[in-house]
Regions:
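C-terminal substrate-binding/catalytic lobe of Rossmann-fold NAD(P)-dependent dehydrogenases
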Residues: 136-143, 152-316
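Conserved N-terminal Rossmann-fold NAD(P) cofactor-binding segment
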Residues: 37-74, 307-316
């Protein structure tokens, strides 16, 4: 009999509820363990998901629980946040004064449960919170990572597909750096159907687009979504679900994520968005792209920005 795949979701707000639904509807989980401090909200989400299961193509068990119940999980997705803090601002750091104390509080509870799987963090500021979780959980390197620039890369893929008419599955690109305003697209590593962007641009005008404009669109995509509905849900939920699938199936697939750097790209002591090999042990390798000198300088600047923001941890 195949081993039952158990996934936990911590935080059942807009994002957490959509993560749970994505895991269920795609058949990624056999069992979902949902945790939230608001017991009535938790009960409501559990009931709603159970009501949906009968019409799903996969059998999924959904139950509410507390942090002690997370011990049985293969993967936990952390999505605790306070989205209302972002109203009137375009800076994910605004959430930091809420999310860091919250994470410090419940990370110890997750650790006390005996959890020994992989944790994927969504909570913002993603790179800083992911590092905080890794420090408190004490799991082996790679077993705690964040969605990071995974969602931003999806936005870039979408923009490139619309611009060129090439299906997004035939495009290779990454957003790197901070999951926030300090990120960039290394254009030298972008390819379509296996050929570099510059090769295409030399022969087809569709590929002679304004690269700065598309990068800006990718960075600002979340705020376009937020401005009309005051949350983001579908994109980040499917990003996290894709990463969970990669872990459960030991895919060894390259995906952009917030990973610990210990010398890669000449950086250390922080988490940042980089291409990673993701498998059963979480981030199993940080892929070092052959960046140009200009792109290397840009990445270092992004990392300096993350370090600067980490200084605020001393005040929390």
């Amino acid at each position: 009999m195949a081993k039952k795949r158990v996934l936990g979701v911590v935080g059942m707000g807009h994002v957490g509820a959509h993560v749970a639904y994505a895991l269920a509807i795609q058949g990624i989980a056999d069992e979902l363990v949902l945790v939230d401090q608001n017991e009535q909200k938790l009960a409501s989400e559990v009931q709603d998901l159970r009501d949906a299961v009968a019409y799903m193509p996969h059998r999924v068990t959904v139950r509410g629980g507390d942090f002690s119940d997370l011990s049985v999980c293969d993967v936990i997705i952390n999505s605790v946040g306070k989205i209302d803090l972002l109203r009137g601002t375009h800076d994910r750091l605004t959430e930091m004064d809420f999310t860091i104390p919250a994470v410090r509080g419940y990370a110890e509870k997750i650790k006390a449960s005996g959890f020994d799987g992989v944790l994927i963090n969504i909570t913002n500021p993603c790179d800083i919170v992911t590092r905080e979780l890794a420090l408190h959980l004490g799991l082996p390197r790679g077993r705690v990572f964040g969605t990071g620039t995974g969602l931003d890369t999806s936005r870039l893929l979408s923009a490139l597909a619309r611009q060129t008419g090439i299906d997004h599955k035939s495009i290779t690109c990454y957003m790197m750096g901070e999951h926030g305003n300090q990120q960039f697209a290394p254009w030298s590593c972008v390819s379509f159907r296996g050929m570099p962007l510059d090769t295409w641009a030399a022969r087809d005008e569709r590929f002679r687009f304004d690269r700065d404009a598309l990068q800006k669109e990718s960075i600002g995509g979340g705020w376009v979504t937020f401005s009309g509905k005051f949350c983001t849900e579908y994109g980040i939920a499917t990003t996290a679900a894709r990463m969970a699938y990669a872990v459960l199936h030991d895919e060894k697939v390259i995906l952009p994520a917030s990973a610990e750097l210990t010398g890669e790209y000449g950086e250390a002591g922080l988490f940042a968005g980089v291409p990673c090999v993701i498998g059963a042990s979480g981030v199993e390798e940080v892929v070092e792209l052959p960046l140009t000198d200009e792109e290397k300088a840009t990445f270092h600047a992004c990392c300096e920005g993350i370090r600067h923001n980490m200084e605020h941890l001393k005040e929390i």
